[in-house]
Swiss-Prot record:
InterPro entries: Ribosomal_uL18_bac-type, Ribosomal_uL18_bac/euk. GO terms for cellular component: chloroplast; ribonucleoprotein complex; ribosome. It is found in: Plastid, Chloroplast. One of its GO terms (biological process) is translation. Part of the 50S ribosomal subunit; contacts the 5S rRNA. GO terms for molecular function: 5S rRNA binding; structural constituent of ribosome. This is Large ribosomal subunit protein uL18c. The gene is rpl18.
Length: 120
């Protein structure tokens, strides 16, 4: 039986999660992309806690005027996530693309986080 698009993405994400494990010294940067928003969080899998989280839903009011599901919004979220993680002392992470291709909004978020000082 053929899988639909959502089932295929979940299957890919499970396959990637078998290989990608976040630790206390190098937590996991998990990205989820929906049709309207993009969400990113840094997770320590050994303790099972979220250390830092941000999304396009909770951007500042001055930035929320231009919230559209595009690469510019993803860059703002990536930069904001990197700034928050630097305050927490997190510099190196393992990137988990959530079963999506490393292209478009996912790539824009990752590149913005790298430019802001995070290491993958």
């Amino acid at each position: 039986m053929k899988l639909n698009t959502k089932q295929t993405r979940i299957h890919k994400h499970k396959r990637v999660r078998k290989k990608v494990q976040g630790t206390s010294s190098r937590p996991r940067l998990c990205v989820f992309r929906s049709n309207k928003h993009i969400y990113a969080q840094i997770i320590d899998d050994t303790q099972g806690i979220t250390l830092v989280a941000t999304s396009s839903v909770n951007l500042n009011n001055k930035e929320s005027d231009n919230i559209r599901p595009n690469c510019d919004t993803s860059r703002v979220v990536g930069k904001q996530l990197a700034e928050q993680s630097m305050k927490e002392g997190i510099k190196n992470v393992v990137f988990d693309r959530g079963g999506k291709l490393y292209h478009g909004r996912v790539k824009a978020l990752a590149e913005a986080a790298k430019e802001a000082g995070m290491g993958f």
